[in-house]
């Protein structure tokens, strides 16, 4: 691998009113190991931001910190601020369950519940005691339409979610996440288990979703990052190296390490 100046950085910022989420001096530790090294970063509203970098660079760890998923790891410790709507999501007194209604997550592999398609969508509402069938029906239809799945499943809503294809299951998981009307949707390599056609359909769904949501996606697929995102951030060994409009990252990167990574020269 070529010698790089790892102190070189190029990180764009946005006016505060355009930012859906901001991290300030965010560190993540696994025991004594520092996995994320003091990242300052903003995410623009109603845009898709891709997080890229070689395996082990910290991009998924960073993504998981944004809605406190690292809380489930005993040895994980997160310091710094995660600012959403003027509130520090990383504060100890935050109701994490309520916060995740605003900052949702779609995981790497489709993980539908062992329930019907309908019950997957209504799960959070029914858990909260909502019984209004008309309201629940509307939530199901709206969420499935936004996830581009309604036309395929509208006559099979009470069949098991496991009868769906992998791509359909992933879009069901997106519908389940957006059913509670989050403002931000986190996606951790959502297409990694999908075939090319299902991946294309997922990306088309993302383009529609960004009209209403801010999307942050981790991907190992450079072509996907180039196609599907407005902004791209390059991570390396826990550091944010470069963050810019996607066209700039792929065609005119300011840091040599970024240019070499996206062109396949290392990583």
Curated annotation (Swiss-Prot):
State the EC number(s).
7.3.2.1
Per the record, the major location class is membrane
Any matching Pfam family: ABC_tran
Q: Does the keyword Cell membrane apply?
A: yes
Q: Where is the ABC transporter domain?
A: 21-262
Q: Does the keyword Ion transport apply?
A: no
Compartments reported by the entry: Cell membrane
Q: Which reaction does it catalyse?
A: phosphate(out) + ATP + H2O = ADP + 2 phosphate(in) + H(+)
Query: What keywords are annotated for this sequence in UniProt?
Result: ATP-binding, Cell membrane, Membrane, Nucleotide-binding, Phosphate transport, Translocase, Transport
The UniProt record gives the binding positions of ATP as 53-60
Membrane topology recorded in Swiss-Prot or TrEMBL? Peripheral membrane protein
Listed GO cellular component terms? plasma membrane
**Which one of the record's GO molecular function terms can you name?**
ATP hydrolysis activity
Task: Give the record's GO biological process terms.
Answer: phosphate ion transmembrane transport
The enzyme's first-digit EC class, named in words, is translocase
The role this protein plays is: Part of the ABC transporter complex PstSACB involved in phosphate import. Responsible for energy coupling to the transport system.
Report the family membership: Belongs to the ABC transporter superfamily. Phosphate importer (TC 3.A.1.7) family.
Assembly notes:
The complex is composed of two ATP-binding proteins (PstB), two transmembrane proteins (PstC and PstA) and a solute-binding protein (PstS).
Q: What is this protein called?
A: Phosphate import ATP-binding protein PstB 2
Can you name the source organism?
Streptococcus agalactiae serotype V (strain ATCC BAA-611 / 2603 V/R)
The organism that produces this protein has a lineage beginning with:
Bacteria, Bacillati, Bacillota, Bacilli, Lactobacillales
């Amino acid at each position: 691998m070529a010698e790089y100046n790892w102190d070189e950085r190029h990180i764009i910022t946005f006016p505060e009113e355009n930012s859906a989420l901001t991290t300030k001096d965010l560190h993540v530790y696994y025991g004594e190991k520092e996995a994320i090294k003091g990242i300052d970063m903003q995410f623009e509203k109603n845009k898709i931001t891709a997080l890229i970098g070689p395996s082990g660079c910290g991009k998924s760890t960073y993504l998981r910190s944004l809605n406190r998923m690292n809380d489930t790891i005993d040895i994980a410790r997160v310091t710094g601020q995660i600012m959403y709507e003027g509130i520090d999501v990383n504060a100890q007194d935050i109701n994490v369950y309520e916060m995740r209604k605003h900052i949702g997550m779609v995981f790497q592999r489709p993980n539908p519940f062992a329930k019907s398609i309908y019950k997957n969508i209504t799960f959070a509402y029914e858990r909260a005691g909502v019984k209004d069938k008309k309201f629940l029906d509307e939530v199901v239809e709206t969420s499935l339409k936004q996830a581009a799945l309604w036309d395929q499943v509208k006559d099979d809503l009470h069949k098991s979610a496991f009868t769906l294809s992998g791509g359909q299951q992933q879009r069901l998981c997106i519908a389940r996440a957006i059913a509670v009307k989050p403002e931000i949707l986190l996606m951790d390599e959502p297409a990694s288990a999908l075939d090319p056609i299902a991946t294309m359909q997922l990306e088309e769904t993302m383009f529609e979703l960004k009209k209403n949501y801010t999307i942050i996606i981790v991907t190992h697929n450079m072509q996907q990052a180039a196609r599907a995102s407005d902004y791209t951030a390059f991570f390396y060994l826990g550091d944010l190296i470069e963050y810019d409009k996607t066209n700039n990252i792929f065609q005119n990167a300011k840091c040599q390490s970024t240019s070499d990574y996206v062109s396949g020269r290392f990583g």
